Regions:
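Extracytosolic ligand-binding ectodomains
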Residues: 1-171
């Protein structure tokens, strides 16, 4: 892992800050994070985000695992939001028939753990906030930047030739 090697090479964030897009609390849980303090990560969720819903989720997770050191992470929060949206789509469709639930998903809204309300778009990507967090010595992140609101999920990059003209509308 890149963060471990940064520590091994004594590369500090003050020398060359690194932004990771796939390193979160779970990945940092097994390594010494003190040499990594100040490096950055970008996610839609960090365990350290201080909202009542997030505190409740973390407490339930730690109780379920019977391990106060187990961390939460962005993929877990995404599943919480996605499952809530699925439940609402089942209610709207009046059935668990997958085709009918898929048709019911666009426009469904559900609270996320960071304090906002996410929405399922017609392309089956959801709106989420974006955060940049700075690694702390305890393996958590301090949020140093966030989007003003929720960012719509895009299925294709407008910057990649061959995908810029594609449209994702699954329904």
């Amino acid at each position: 892992p890149v963060y471990r090697e940064l520590g091994n090479q004594a590369i500090k964030a003050t020398d060359m800050p690194v932004v990771a897009f796939s390193v979160g609390e779970e990945e940092l849980a097994g390594i010494d994070t003190k040499p990594l303090v100040g490096h950055l990560a970008a996610w839609n969720y960090f365990e350290s985000i201080d909202t009542p819903a997030n505190k409740e989720f973390i407490a339930k997770w730690k109780a379920f695992t019977k391990n106060p050191k187990r961390v939460t992470n962005d993929p877990m929060e995404a599943h919480v939001v996605g499952f809530q949206m699925w439940v609402e789509a089942v209610k709207k469709a009046g059935t668990v028939n997958p085709d009918k639930v898929i048709d019911a998903l666009p426009g469904i809204k559900a609270p996320n753990l960071t304090g906002g309300i996410s929405e399922m778009l017609p392309n089956h990507h959801i709106t989420k906030p974006v955060f940049i967090g700075e690694v702390r010595g305890d393996g958590q992140f301090d949020v140093v930047w966030k989007t003003e609101g929720l960012v719509p999920g895009a299925a294709w990059s407008p910057h990649l030739e061959g995908s810029k003209d594609l449209v994702a509308d699954w329904v």
